Structure formats: C-alpha cells, structure tokens
Amino acid sequence: MNKVYLVAILVLSVLLVANVSPIEGVPTGGCPLSDALCAKYCKSNKYGKTGKCTGTSKGTCKCLV
C-alpha cells in the first residue's frame, strides 16, 4: 500500500512540474520585476538607452533607443 501512495505522489509532482512554463533561453532583463532592471539590462548590454517591460504579464524587456 505504501508503494501505491509513493507512486501517486510521484505522478502528482511530475504533473505539477510539467504545468510550469518552461524557462526560455532568452533573458528577460529583470521583467516582470521592474522597468528599472530592464533599463539597466539594456544599457549594460548596449541594446539601447532605456527599456520597458511589455507583453503579457509584463514578462518581456523591450529595449528602446
């Protein structure tokens, strides 16, 4: 009976992990935490002079020239 519970917990944990969005290799530049981190990211990587968090749930850093 303990093995059944162990398998059930294992299956549930795998399902929960599978529902989490995969982390893409593209850096977000501090988004969705703050626009200031995004701007700092843009300046330090020479992508632009300022930046702003945009997109759904403000999860993408858009660098502005």
From Swiss-Prot:
Subcellular location as annotated: Secreted
Entry domain remark: Has the structural arrangement of an alpha-helix connected to antiparallel beta-sheets by disulfide bonds (CS-alpha/beta).
GO cellular component assignments: extracellular region
Example GO molecular function: potassium channel regulator activity
Signal peptide coordinates: 1-25
Main localization (coarse): secreted
Origin: domain of life: Eukaryota
The family this protein is said to belong to: Belongs to the short scorpion toxin superfamily. Potassium channel inhibitor family. Alpha-KTx 11 subfamily.
Lineage: Eukaryota, Metazoa, Ecdysozoa, Arthropoda, Chelicerata
Disulfide bonds: 31-53, 38-61, 42-63
Tissue localization of expression: Expressed by the venom gland.
Protein name: Putative potassium channel toxin Ts21
Keyword Hydrolase: no
Its biological purpose: This recombinant toxin inhibits the mammalian voltage-gated potassium channels Kv1.3/KCNA3 in vitro with an IC(50) of 26.40 nM.
Record key words, sorted: Disulfide bond, Ion channel impairing toxin, Neurotoxin, Potassium channel impairing toxin, Secreted, Signal, Toxin, Voltage-gated potassium channel impairing toxin
Signal found in the keyword field: yes
